[in-house]
Amino acid sequence: MTRIISWGAAVLATALVVTAASARLRAQGATINKRTFLTFSAPVQVPGATLPAGTYVFRIANPAVQTVWQVFDANERHLLAQFFFVPTGDRTIQEQNRAHGKPVVRFHETPRGVAPPMNVLYYPTNPAGYVFLYPRAQAEQIAALTHQPVLATDSDPTKSSLAHVMTV
């Protein structure tokens, strides 16, 4: 018995398969580059920039290397900051469970009126966090305000995928 499928049905089936496959790839891409939307109600500092209140997209610049975060506006049209990070494993299972699948940000404590600098970002599905490396001058300012050590670098993430890490 020979089955004849109309061209319309074949095109529809192909379109459904392509749509499903592309949706799956987009979902995997968000996991690979750790694409995360964060909304802040007040200004915050990231390495190399102070972000006004608003929504931002944080993502890994190169998933193959995973040493640099990028921060974009909510529409991902403008790159606002690009900086190195180092992994940290200081989050407990209980903390991960309390996050309920949402990203968690830890800030350096600063005096009132000073935009708090982001210290660690925990991606929802990863028990390890990402400690942000601040440019040396900015790290020295943060350390002076917080009286705490701050991880810093004198490396440029636009020129290298490797960072020289120091504590100030």
What annotation goes with each model-predicted range?
Residues 21-27:
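Sec/Tat signal peptide C-region and signal peptidase I cleavage site
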Residues 10-19:
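Bacterial N-terminal signal peptides
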Residues 27-45:
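Short acidic, Pro/Gly- and aromatic-enriched capping/linker segments at domain boundaries
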Residues 66-120:
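Mid-chain, structured segments of secreted extracytoplasmic proteins
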Residues 138-168:
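Compositionally biased, proline/threonine/alanine/serine-rich low-complexity intrinsically disordered stretches
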Residues 54-60:
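A short tyrosine-centered beta-strand micro-motif
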Residues 1-11:
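Bacterial N-terminal signal peptides that target proteins for export
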